[in-house]
Amino acid sequence: MDNSIHSTDGPDSVIPNSNPKKTVRQRVRLLARHLTTREGLIGDYDYGFLFRPELPFMKKDPRAPPFFGLNEKIPVLLAFILGLQHALAMLAGVVTPPLIISSSLSLPSDLQQYLVSTSLIVCGLLSMVQITRFHIYKTPYYIGSGVLSVMGVSFSIISVASGAFNQMYSNGFCQLDEAGNRLPCPEAYGALIGTSACCALVEILLAFVPPKVIQKIFPPIVTGPTVMLIGISLIGTGFKDWAGGSACMDDGMLCPSATAPRPLPWGSPEFIGLGFLVFVSIILCERFGAPIMKSCSVVIGLLVGCIVAAACGYFSHADIDAAPAASFIWVKTFPLSVYGPMVLPIIAVFIICACECIGDVTATCDVSRLEVRGGTFESRIQGAVLADGINSVVAALATMTPMTTFAQNNGVIALTRCANRWAGYCCCLILIVAGIFAKFAAAIVAIPNSVMGGMKTFLFASVVISGQAIVAKAPFTRRNRFILTASMALGYGATLVPTWFGNVFPQTENRDLEGFENAIELVLETGFAVTAFVAMLLNAIMPAEVEEIGAVTPMPVSAHDNRDGEAEYQSKQA
């Protein structure tokens, strides 16, 4: 891959052989010069811009910092700082899904720590694939987008996993103790990742479908409400943890357990206060924080909550002390299997991931000052979706749930004006190192539920807003309002009352028929799957109303409407 300097005025593509290849000797000389000179190590970048808070009495600098394109030379220190900023921006999103999924299965703390470590390592390794972009030999196809797009664990799988686990505990796939509490069930996690590995083939096939066709089949009026329902179904998880945890909500129980350092009843004011502290800290970072604080405000809020919780005695250090010094992929394994009822919902997850990937990479290209139309752009989209699918297969084999392209990092690019891939590589390296040090994962697992709940509530609400932003791209005609109403009515209902379809089918002793009925039941009790199906069906059969064509002005959908965030930045500086 040629990483030579390109002009920021023209398209910055990664087409092979676009520049003469350098010899190994020339590359070594350039690297040595980059690492041994002040220009290469520090440069003349205004580092104060990243750390300067926006306080009311401080004078704002009207000058915009320089823009670093995809392949431009960038100082080593700046690449590391911005890589750290990208890593912090995605940290909460990377560790939250494995924490929720492992808690749903009552997995022991050592397995939870392993999954958090593996999540960080896998995200770092697979993000490198997405950022680098590989050409498939003797084909017009690529693997990877070639831009600063990072991979993270998909939130969409949490709702499917939660419903499937409930079904597994009720049908005997997983066991309960005499009191009705869930026993650890690693077999269920193996079924989840095994089914995901098979269903990821759907997204791989979608990568070879032209993006325009995908967007026609899954327009914003379909994907928007689906993403909204994913976030809505997860907010309840955050609120339960905010009040102490989902496993101790019954009367007379203490949270998180009777053996915890400071056990309290669910909903105690101490728990509410800790979560509220995290929530308020996030707001204060966004209002008064420096650019580097704004992009990682969720992590800073979590850190503030952890400090106060530790000072008040809510932390348990036993698991941290018992954790190994290092961890890696496959240190622990799970028995892989395919759970039939999960197939259809997980296929829906990968379709949503493909649609999200197209939108995220389009936004990344725009803020990176790259073309957002034409052959090169379409090849980036194809490579990104293909990398999404392949990475999900690899992630499943590495004991991790499905992966998707993260959108948080587009905000970091727009804010810092750095789209350089070397900042992305530094981000990947930081994630991998953080995952290898198992004590870091153990510290995350030991964070009190109320602190995590305040962070999760904010994080999952941002998923809802992302869905609303997608819906806003479609004109609000009568037809679209009807599709939204019908699809979200059933989706909301299934989310609020997830057991509404549980007694429709009679009991049967036919195992094959029971498996088919369980699959239908799981789909209809998963809110976002219901919304996606109804929206797709109505969008296909509902004709456009002639009197509304041209009468409604669509909201702008082009990513050029806020080119690389510069207009937003300048408006803030004014």
UniProtKB/Swiss-Prot annotation:
Effect of T416N: Decreases affinity for uric acid significantly more than affinity for xanthine. Confers ability to grow on hypoxanthine
GO BP: any one term: xanthine transport
Cross-link (Glycyl lysine isopeptide (Lys-Gly) (interchain with G-Cter in ubiquitin)): K572
Consequence the record notes for mutating G411A: Decreases affinity for uric acid significantly more than affinity for xanthine. Confers ability to grow on hypoxanthine
Induction remarks: Inducible by 2-thiouric acid, and highly repressible by ammonium.
Gene Ontology annotations for the cellular component aspect, listed alphabetically: autophagosome lumen; endosome membrane; fungal-type vacuole; plasma membrane
Spans through the membrane: 77-97, 111-131, 141-161, 188-209, 217-237, 264-284, 296-315, 338-361, 427-447, 451-471, 482-502, 522-542
Molecular function terms from GO: purine nucleobase binding; urate transmembrane transporter activity; xanthine transmembrane transporter activity
Effect on the protein upon substituting N420S: Does not significantly affect substrate affinities at 37 degrees Celsius but has no uptake activity at 25 degrees Celsius
Keyword Cell membrane: yes
Region (Disordered): 1-20, 555-574
Major localisation: membrane
Subcellular location, record wording: Cell membrane
Keywords per UniProt: Cell membrane, Isopeptide bond, Membrane, Transmembrane, Transmembrane helix, Transport, Ubl conjugation
Keyword Cell inner membrane: no
Effect of N409Q: Increases affinity for xanthine, but not uric acid, 9-methylxanthine or 8-azaxanthine
Effect upon mutating N409S: Does not significantly affect substrate affinities at 37 degrees Celsius but has no uptake activity at 25 degrees Celsius
PTM description: Ubiquitinated by hulA. Ubiquitination leads to internalization, sorting into the endosomal pathway to the vacuolar lumen where uapA is eventually degraded.
Membrane topology per record: Multi-pass membrane protein
Pfam families: Xan_ur_permease
Family classification: Belongs to the nucleobase:cation symporter-2 (NCS2) (TC 2.A.40) family.
Function: Uric acid-xanthine transporter.
Name of the molecule in the record: Uric acid-xanthine permease
Classification lineage: Eukaryota, Fungi, Dikarya, Ascomycota, Pezizomycotina
